[in-house]
Amino acid sequence: VMFPIMDGKGRVVGFGGRVMDDSTPKYLNSPECQIFEKGKILFAFDKAYKSIREEKQAILVEGYMDVISAHNKGVTNVVASLGTAYTKDHGHILMRQADEIILAYDMDGAGRQAVTRAIELLQNTDFKVRVLAMPDGKDPDDYVRNHGGKAFKELVEKAVKPLDYLLSESLIK
């Protein structure tokens, strides 16, 4: 399955592909070039920025399907970092629209590490940051498809402060 990757103005700057079987790599993006730098693009920002501005909140997820499922169920302030790497450039994109960032990455090993790195990058910013630890190790796509947009919004309301998340993570280890 191929996904067009657009810049903030809705112009196609690259493509992302996802295999539908168990082969690897699971995702493959266009190579980085002058118009496509993965760390400077938020997937679906061109569609989400109005909702982000209205709600003053951006929900940051990892991948295409997380965003698409959320938007299809009416949760339209969701964007993806195209993997697990949140960057300062992502923050610059969001700072004009949002006061709060909800980190809603997958709760696998890579996702947990990415949340910790994102918390570090966000700690000296003006953003209010909360972390949504998806229940039962699910990713946002699975959760939204199985429970719906309203349930996802309710889950977002229960997102915790970064320190609470980090403390709970240290207790798990």
Regions found by a protein language model. Name each.
Residues 75-78, 118-121, 146-149:
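Short secondary-structure boundary/capping segments
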Residues 4, 105-109, 154, 173:
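Generic amphipathic alpha-helical segments used as scaffolds and interaction surfaces in large
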Residues 1-97, 101, 114-115:
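Phosphate-handling DNA/RNA-contact segment within nucleic-acid enzymes
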Residues 113, 117-118, 123, 169-173:
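Electropositive, surface-exposed helix/loop patches at the edges of structured domains
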Residues 65, 86, 105-115, 133, ...:
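Acidic, metal-coordinating catalytic cores used for nucleic-acid/nucleotide bond scission
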Residues 93, 120-127:
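Arginine/glycine-rich "motif VI" loop of SF2 helicases in the C-terminal RecA-like domain
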Residues 100, 106-107, 150:
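Histidine- and aromatic-rich ligand-binding microenvironments
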